[in-house]
Amino acid sequence: MTSLQPPGAGDLPPVRHVPDAAAHIRGYLRRTGRRLAVLDDDPTGSQAVHGVSVLTAPHPSGYANGLASPGDTCFVLTNSRSLDRAGAVAAHQAAARDLYTWEVGSGGTVEIVSRGDSTLRGHVTAEVDAVAAQRLASTGVATDGVLFCPAMLEAGRFTVGDTHFAVVDGVPTPVADTEFARDRTFGYTRSNLREFLAEQSGGAITAAEVASLSHDDIRTGGPQRVAEVLASLTHRRWVVVNAADHADLAVVALGLQLAQEAGRRFLV
């Protein structure tokens, strides 16, 4: 698919294609004994993937099957987008508690992904905070950084210059200027993702403290530069992932794995 780019953005660095990136990513997961548990706030997430297990409700008995082997991925449907903030926090906290309890007992590593809406509707920061707090309580492991990556390229949602866009009627449009931002429950006014996180968190996160993985970092610097940016994160600091091509996501995943190998811990 063609890389996405908003009008007037200027020339982005050329897309960086890493040979056999997918194989390297999968190989790392198997080699390090990692499993991916995706807490999905809406059933549409699991409908866009294949080759993974899906639990229609969080339950400890399902994890042994869904995460049986290193490299396995399991979607866990929390349906928390339909809940109020307190209910969403409770749902993610309970799922994370069971997953980290399973991790401790299995001897493997579970990497939890909080899967939300590519148009930014949902309990974004509250759910991640709940997972990070539960990880610390269950395993004693603190979260160094949180990667915020709402791109869904197949649907025309992408991020350039820290601003998130949705293609509407063929035109890339800042998401705050779309109908999605006028949602009665999850409305927002900011397209810049640093500013969005500040708005969505009620000021608990400031735009200035949010880091960024720019297209220059990703496409010019490659996985090593991505790892350097991620290694600088501490105390659960958020970082915006700029992505307009699947190759951008592959480079970020490879850089994330380099940072993990150096002992850093993240949520996505």
Q: What spans do the regions from the language model cover?
A:
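N-terminal basic/disordered segments at the start of proteins
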Residues: 6-70
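Cap/lid and interdomain-hinge subdomains that line or gate substrate/regulatory clefts
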Residues: 26-40, 70-72, 82-112, 116-249
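N-terminal low-complexity or amphipathic/hydrophobic leaders
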Residues: 38-40, 44-45, 254-255, 266-268
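A short, acidic, amphipathic alpha-helical segment used as a generic capping/interface helix at domain edges
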Residues: 57-67, 220-232, 253-258
